[in-house]
Amino acid sequence: MITDLRPPAMEPAELIWQDGVPESARFGDVYFSRDDGLAETRYVFIERNGLPGRFAELDRNSHFVIAETGFGTGLNFLATWAEWLAQRPDDQDHAILHFISVERYPLALADLEKALESWPGLQPLARELIDNYPPLIKGTHRLVLGGGAIRLTLCFGDVLDAWNELEFVADAWFLDGFAPSLNPDMWLEKAIHQIRAHSQPGTTLATFTSVGRVRRALADEGFEMAKVPGFGRKREMLTGRLPTSEDVSAPTVGTDPIVIIGAGIAGAALARNLAERGVPVVLADQASGPGAGASGNDQGALYVKLGVEYNDQTELAATALSFSQRFYQRWQGEFWHPSGLLQLAATDQEQDRQRRFLERNTYPENMLAAVTAAEASRIAGMPVQCEGLWFPSSGWIQPARACQTLIDHPHIRTVFDFNVDTLRYVDNHWVIKASDGRSLRATKVVVAAGHESGSLAPVPDGQSLRLKPIRGQVTRLPADDCQLPDVVVCGTKYLNPAYDGSAITGATFDLRDDNPEPTPEGHQENLDQLRELLPSVNISKHIQAEHLEGRVAFRCATHDYQPVAGPCPDNNEISRTGVYLLTGLGSKGLVWAPLLAEYLADRICQQPACLNTRLARRVETGRLYRNQLTV
């Protein structure tokens, strides 16, 4: 258990175990019925919300949204997932179950695993949940499960904060949590008002409680409430429904192809995300294959430098790091190598920064931990002279191979050597013309072309996108001519473990250099700074910078060094309906791409967003314009 707790770490639930049933020490109540918790969940939440029939009748390529007021052990979620599979056995119909749940005191991973051992029939699903369970830090965590058919949005924090900041409309509510007499904050009128705000005609709810003030508060918000027999020895429970004169159905994902311009890691991740939701994608790039630009290196480190203050910017970065680690684990053994990663405090400035970072923040150890020089040496498998931060769930990626793997999907069609000349709106479609005369048509277009996005995206007269290219040169070190670490090591430069006889180190940061070819000076800079970071690397004296191999790529950065994902603003001068931007990922594209692809796919498909409104503002597109526009 975490002691001396500071943000962003969440206080985990303290459990008392009695005959295998977890009870909250804080609230003095059990998480599920001692008689049969699974049967209780099915009776109270699944059957009383009419979910079996509603799941079965849901259209292909549609989605269903359930919101819950207390995640607890995840039993309600797993039972609902199992019911979804029972009613929708065709895993190719591309319907999606969104399950949104809030938890103020989340279970520690070991407690979650122990609690779910009681349900052997749910074990395959429980195992997938456990393997994807996020670190206990405050914020919104999206878990993509069941091959993409199940999307769990798990909010660690206060229920009112979560409902105020999330954008979704629920089809059904599970009003769980502990009894109103034991956990009154969960049942405040403000919380019930938010339940109504996230509902629509036809939305249903169910709760184990039958307390009068809860029933009256929900009725005052417009729900038609009823008392029905409770489960087991419980006499009564409540159900409710917002009245409607007609059936309400969720929007279905369109069957028109979406064109994505740019086949780097951002475009590839988005193409894969949309394809797995049943959206056909045409992926176009000016190069002859994917990952030809900034995503073309043989090795890339998965890391961010988290801020000393846990503000919105830091929360977004932490959320992206955690999501990317979960995302890539699906491809472990293909292009993802979870070696772990060390961030060394190799300079006086970084030592001071890490000291202040550790004084002001607490992170769970499965996300990051402070290590001494001796501990860092043991982890790296080579002498390290300074302390640092250890990220056990990070590692390195083969970016070019990742791009190729991600776009290998039957719903993705690729068009290479497609050098975009114009992007114009004609007859309710966007027409993308290439310089060789070829053209593509689509109602929706995503520009994910790095720093070239600025010349491709339609903008109002007199406007331009505040994007800039930053040259980065990496150097390939022969493994036989130096000592290499067992894990990724980062500082002023980064160094990857050996792979296929070499390791990539770098990269330079050249704001005013447009040379596309590697230079001896760039290699020498990488070597010199690597020797300062890791003297024990023992680079052979016969290695000459002019004889080393390497690669140059141009990262795309915004004016504020924050990424961009969302629809292009429209000030009514020209129609930009259906044009989206995904760019400005900078040197951390491997971290940003999975989360922002998920968020943008949510927006495009009109599904609940994985980012709350506060974090979504950090990536909005309007801030890129010289005179900011609203989206």
Swiss-Prot record:
Q: Which cofactor does it need?
A: FAD
What's any one GO cellular component for it?
A: cytoplasm
Region annotation (FAD-dependent cmnm(5)s(2)U34 oxidoreductase) maps to 261-631
Q: Where in the cell is it found?
A: Cytoplasm
Reactions performed catalytically: 5-aminomethyl-2-thiouridine(34) in tRNA + S-adenosyl-L-methionine = 5-methylaminomethyl-2-thiouridine(34) in tRNA + S-adenosyl-L-homocysteine + H(+)
NCBIfam families per record: MnmC_Cterm, PRK01747.1-2, tRNA_MNMC2
Q: Which family does it belong to?
A: In the N-terminal section; belongs to the methyltransferase superfamily. tRNA (mnm(5)s(2)U34)-methyltransferase family.
Q: What is the stated purpose of this protein?
A: Catalyzes the last two steps in the biosynthesis of 5-methylaminomethyl-2-thiouridine (mnm(5)s(2)U) at the wobble position (U34) in tRNA. Catalyzes the FAD-dependent demodification of cmnm(5)s(2)U34 to nm(5)s(2)U34, followed by the transfer of a methyl group from S-adenosyl-L-methionine to nm(5)s(2)U34, to form mnm(5)s(2)U34.
Its protein name is tRNA 5-methylaminomethyl-2-thiouridine biosynthesis bifunctional protein MnmC
Species assigned in the record = Marinobacter nauticus (strain ATCC 700491 / DSM 11845 / VT8)
